[in-house]
Each structure stands twice: as C-alpha cells, then as structure tokens.
C-alpha cells in the first residue's frame, strides 16, 4: 500500500495566512495576475494555503465575492520554501501588472559553480583536442564536442531568453550565452539566481 505523504504546509498555514493578511497589496496582485480577476477589487482574503495551491476570496466593487484558486507549480516541498516562493510570486505579479520595474543585470560575474563542476570537463576535452592521445581515435573528439553542443545548445537558448528580458547590455548578455554554450548549466543557474535576488531587492524597497 502506497504511503501518503503529509502536506508540509497545512499544519503551519495559519502563520502564512496571518502574515499575508497584513499585505493586502500582495493578495490583490496575486488575484489580478495569477487569478485573472477582472474589474476593481476592494479586498482579498486568503482562505486556504497548502503545498499545491492557495485559495483567495476576492471582494469586488459591487460587493460580490469571487473565489480564486492559484496553483503552486512545482508544489512546495517543505515549509521553509513557502516564503521565498510567495515573495517571488509577488514580484512577478507586480512586474506583470506594471507596478514595479523588471530587474536588470548590468554586469557579468563568472559563476563560482562552474569552477567546481563543468570547467574541468571542458578543459579536459580541450586538452584531448589539441594534444595527441594514442588511445583515442580521430572520430571520438568530434563526437564529444557534438555531444557538448547537443546538451549545452538548448541551455544557451534558454539563457538568451533570460538575457533578452533581464540583461541591460549586449556584452553581459553575450557573455552569459557563450558561457552557457561552452560550460553549460552553471551560467544560466547563476543568471537566474541573480535575477531572483534583484527581484527580492526591488520588492524590499517598496514594502
């Protein structure tokens, strides 16, 4: 018989509901952006929250009520993930509604994660490419580079979409895209983390 995993949020949902009830602008932003509630909203109550969704009760200008269920994707794995996720959702909603500026990254920083991971495999491949090795056939190296391109290519495209929206100059954007093309995931992960940090900072300034 399959074991039922307990929801990590339900037992502490009262804490989250209490904190969010003090942020009416956040709940309205959720309702407008994620819930697609049309028309003026005079108030929003958070009626429920769990690992998979939050439920809002919106009071419209004519006095009527509208219930909105907003899915959390992916679901929250633990309670400690709730506040960062809700804050990120708030920043995205405020950006989408035009109430705050989209975060812009203006400088390039070589990701420390790359120094611990993919840089060594790429360096090894470069060495084998230019230094003859009697144990490798001529076809193996091109195949290895083709595999790198096949794996890193889609990641570079994803990085380009992030850079197009969130990077403020061509040099920085190209650096992240080329870095991803050569070294892979450490570059797009670093860029996404910097964007998230910039979002949090922008919200902190308007709270």
From Swiss-Prot:
Coiled-coil ranges from the UniProt annotation: none
InterPro entries: DUF2470, Haem_oxidase_HugZ-like_sf
Biotechnology: The structure of strobilurin A was used for the development of the major class of beta-methoxyacrylate agricultural fungicides since its beta-methoxyacrylate toxophore targets the Qo site of complex III of the mitochondrial electron transport chain and prevents adenosine triphosphate synthesis. Compounds such as azoxystrobin (Syngenta) and Kresoxim methyl (BASF) are among the most widely used fungicides worldwide. This class of antifungals are used as effective treatments against a broad range of destructive fungal plant pathogens and make significant contributions to food security.
Membrane topology category: Multi-pass membrane protein
Main location: membrane
Subcellular location: Membrane
Alphabetical keyword list: Membrane, Transmembrane, Transmembrane helix
Gene3D superfamilies noted in UniProt: PNP-oxidase-like (3.20.180.10)
Record's GO cellular component terms: membrane
Transmembrane segments annotated in the record for this chain: 108-128, 169-189
Induction: Induced in strobilurin-producing conditions (on CGC medium after 6 days of growth).
Involved pathway(s): Mycotoxin biosynthesis
Function: Part of the gene cluster that mediates the biosynthesis of strobilurin A, an antifungal polyketide that contains a key beta-methoxyacrylate toxophore that targets the complex III of the mitochondrial electron transport chain. Strobilurin biosynthesis begins with construction of benzoyl CoA by step-wise elimination of ammonia from phenylalanine by the phenylalanine ammonia-lyase str11, oxygenation by str8 and retro-Claisen reaction to form benzoic acid, which is activated to its CoA thiolester benzoyl CoA by the dedicated CoA ligase str10.
The protein's name: Strobilurin A biosynthesis cluster protein r1
Source organism of the structure: Strobilurus tenacellus
């Amino acid at each position: 018989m399959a074991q039922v995993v307990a929801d990590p949020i339900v037992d502490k949902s009262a804490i989250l509901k209490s904190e969010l009830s003090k942020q009416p602008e956040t709940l309205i932003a959720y309702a407008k952006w994620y819930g697609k509630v049309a028309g003026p909203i005079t108030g929003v109550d958070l009626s429920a929250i769990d690992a998979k969704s939050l439920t809002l009760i919106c009071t419209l200008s004519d006095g009527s009520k509208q219930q909105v269920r907003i899915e959390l994707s992916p679901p929250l794995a633990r309670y400690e993930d709730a506040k960062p996720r809700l804050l990120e959702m708030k920043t995205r909603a405020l950006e989408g509604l035009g109430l705050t500026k989209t975060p812009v990254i203006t400088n390039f920083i070589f990701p420390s994660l790359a120094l611990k991971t993919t840089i060594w495999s790429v360096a090894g491949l470069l060495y084998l490419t230019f230094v003859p090795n009697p144990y490798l056939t001529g076809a193996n190296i091109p195949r290895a580079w083709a595999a790198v391109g096949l794996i890193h290519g889609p990641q570079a495209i994803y990085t380009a979409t992030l850079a197009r929206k969130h990077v403020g100059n061509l040099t920085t954007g190209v650096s992240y895209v080329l870095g991803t093309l050569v070294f892979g995931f450490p570059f797009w992960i670093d860029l996404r983390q910097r964007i998230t940090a910039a979002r949090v900072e922008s919200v902190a300034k308007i709270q």
